Amino acid sequence: MNTTNYEDIWQASLIHVTDEFALPPVVLQAGEAIIGTLGNFSVSTGKAKAKKTFNVSAIVAAALVNGQVLEYQASFPESKRTILYFDTEQSPYHCQLVMQRILRLAELPIDKEPQNLKFSHLRAIADPNERREIIRYAIYNTPNVGLVVIDGIRDLMLDINNSTEATKLVGDLMQWTSEQNIHIQTEIGRAHV
């Protein structure tokens, strides 16, 4: 028996013209352009070898120092300074190279573990649903998360062309960002778009 009270959900979802809403906290900018707010997600797209990972590395470096790196500016609240980075495509060796690049861009030492960056490689996990559950677990069980990067979001689905799977994945992103008040930065190759 379904016990969901749709009347309560419906009433809670209504927006009134007299309601007051503030712009969600802007946490990532490129120049004057807003590229990230808490409670939302964004997608970097481009062809293979189009420097998507480099740009995301610069964004993460800016978030790591909570300041400017190249053209990116980050301003996360102190309670949202932890960064989770998930790579679904590369080997641990290549993931470590990306992590070192992030640290160099942030002008931080590459021989000392960064306090608020957790970098996870998920390539060896074959089941896309298990990858997704690991990401969900980390988001909900890591203190002070403000930024989550998913490099290779297409690897969280079995079939990129399946609209049901795509809708469920986008629903997860919306739920995670909303419930945890975080920004999720995803990356996908243009061949998958």
Protein language model regions, located:
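The Walker A/P-loop phosphate-binding site
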Residues: 2-102
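Structural motif
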Residues: 43, 147-151, 185
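Substrate-engagement module of ASCE P-loop NTPases
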Residues: 141, 167-190
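Short, well-ordered beta-to-alpha junction loops that form the rim of enzyme active sites
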Residues: 47, 153, 189-190
